[in-house]
Amino acid sequence: MIIKNGNVFQEDGSYKVADLYVENGRIVASADELTDKTELDASGLKVLPGLVDIHSHGAVRHDFSDADVDGLRTILQYEKSQGITSYCPTSMTLPKEELLKIFQTAKDVEQDETCARIVGINMEGPFLDPVKKGAHVEGYIRKPDIEFFRACNEAAGGMIKLVTLAPNMEGSEEFIRELHNEVVISIGHTAADLSLIHISEPTRRSYISY
C-alpha cells in the first residue's frame, strides 16, 4: 500500500508531506519493495504511529470491570477510532470471583481490524494500601498474594502484564521476588517512603502508577 501526500510524523516531532510505503504491516523504503501498490490519499491528514494506552478502565459508558465481552469490544473499537492501536484494559479492586470473570473476558473478546489490539492486562488492585485506596473499595483490598495473582493470570490466559503493588503491605517483598520476572511490578496506591520504593536486585520495580 502507498499512503500518499500525508503529513508524515518525523523523528524530530515535526510533520512533512510525503508518501509512505507499507508492506505486510511494515514501513519499507520504496515502492520497489511493494507487492500491493494500492494508493490511499491522505492529503490534509496526519500520518503517525498508533498510540499505546496501558492504563484505561473503559470508555463510552463501558468499563472493563463490567466483565462484559460485548462492552469490552465496544471499548476496543472506540479506542481504535481515536488512534489507539495497542491497549491494556485495566481492572479495579474487586472480589476474586469477579476478577476471574473480568480477566476471562479479555481472553475471550473477539478482536478484528476495527479494534485496538489487547497487548496485555493492567491489574490495578487488590494489592493496595488502604490509606491510599483512592476510588478502590477498601473492603476488597488484600495483602499481596502470589497464588491469587497466578489464578487471575491463568483466567486471563497469561495476559496480565502489569500489576500494581503497595510495597509497604505485608507480603510485598515475597510477591516481588517471586514474580518480578513474570510481570511488570508497578508501585502505586501506597504510603511507602523511598526506603521501600528503592530499586534493588533482585526485586526490581520498573513502573509507577498514580
Region roles according to the model:
Residues 142-200:
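Histidine/acidic residue-rich metal-binding segments in metalloenzymes
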Residues 1-48:
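Histidine-rich, glycine-flanked metal-binding segment
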Residues 6, 25, 44, 55, ...:
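Divalent metal-coordination and catalytic microenvironments
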Residues 77-88, 130-157, 200:
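Active-site gating loops and adjacent loop-to-helix segments of metal-dependent hydrolytic enzymes
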Residues 76, 100-107, 149, 176:
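Generic structural signal for well-ordered alpha-helices
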Residues 197-210:
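Single conserved hydrophobic/aromatic residue that forms the stacking wall/gate
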Residues 45-67:
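Di-metal (Zn2+ and/or Mg2+/Mn2+) metal-binding site signature of metallo-dependent hydrolases
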Residues 57, 73-102, 116-129, 156-168, ...:
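Divalent metal-dependent hydrolysis catalytic cores, especially in the metallo-beta-lactamase
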